[in-house]
Amino acid sequence: MGRVRNKKWIVRACAFWFCLASAQAAVELGIDVLKSQDYSLLKGKRVGLITNQTGADSDGTKTRLLLKQHCNLVALYTPEHGLDGTEKAGRYVKSRRDRATGVMAYSLYGPTRKPTPAMLRGVDVLVFDLQDIGCRSYTYISTMGRCMEAAGENKIPFVVLDRPNPVGGLRVEGPSVEPRWRSFVSEFPIPYVHGLTVGELARMVNGRHWTSVPCDLTVVQMHGWRRGMTWDDTGLRWIPSSPNIPRGTSPLYYIATGLVGELSGPEIGIPGPRPFQSIGARRVDPASFTRYLRGIDAPGVEFRPWREGSIGGSSLTISPDAPANLTGLGIYMLSELNRQTRPDLFRRTEGSKLDIFYKVCGGTFIRDQVREGIPPRTVVASWRPNEDEFRRTRAKYLLY
């Protein structure tokens, strides 16, 4: 009997490790493909790398360490949150020398958001390896765009080591950006959720002339990634991309509640162990708010009453493949919170913070629609022509 149990245990263990190995092999990142090609694309060139802690191969080895060992790495460039991803959102990052490589790490989230000619001196090729989250307001894609522009201006080739979009390649949601509201949190005229990998977006930025000067662009494609994959399907380990994106599912919650959290009044679980996974405000009744949310069409999303001190609202559980329009869900939550709050959320929010809200939204239209009492379903439906047009326009830039 003991032998039979041992055999069963061995079979189960083998099955477990086989499944684990299969999951790990599901997707090869751009950096993995570059490694398999013996870094031939970068050999004999002085390399500048735009990266942070998310720039790593599928085994977790940092891209900057790999390029230091196998190529001539001469400069690093870091986005919001810094080289280690620990700085708070919106906080300026200082340039410093990286202890791990001995290479200077120039901050692109300080006095400048774009590499200066001095920062690019002695660089033959710029390489981008950052993990994005698939949402327009997350600034890593803005950093990519500014670096592409600098590369074009200085006639430096630009290489993107591609990575998965953690919310998948099929989800396209939200309004575009009005020209006067383009900013570092809305750098490109794309929907709030774009469904592109960074490599595909780079191709679109170049092809649509969204920078002042196009660059000589190469995308090192992934192997094994498909548009229907969310992060959990890739078999890859998630490296927190910033302090409040600790898990591979965090981008889903960021999309749903992050926009509302730009206003004064709403609480979205920050600081805390579950950022973006709850939403509420003072004197909001958790039961009635949750009952309202359960009455809307949000397949794949569960709501539970949530209270913390005087804050009332709901906690969210979002399935990675939830069909619900998560940006639209944010409008429902914003509308109901605004209805239950006095004075309304927009009057509570001071000028500079309200300005950030408009920039994240891409204009003042969401404020206007909510204040006018336009039903959320009508607001969300008004986005569809833009979403459909974007799907058609982006098609020629897709790689997967």
Where are these predicted regions, by residue range?
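Bacterial N-terminal signal peptides
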Residues: 12-21
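Short internal beta-strands
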Residues: 74-81, 161
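Glycine-rich, charge-decorated loop segments at or immediately adjacent to ligand/cofactor-binding or catalytic sites
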Residues: 85-90, 159-181
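Glycine-rich oxoanion-binding loops at beta->alpha junctions
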Residues: 93-123, 135
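Glycine/threonine-rich flexible loop motifs
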Residues: 132-144
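Conserved anion/nucleotide-ligand pocket segment
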Residues: 182-254
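Glycine-rich, aromatic-lined ligand/substrate-binding cores of catalytic
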Residues: 225-302
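Conserved functional hotspot residues or short segments at active or partner-binding sites
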Residues: 275, 279-381
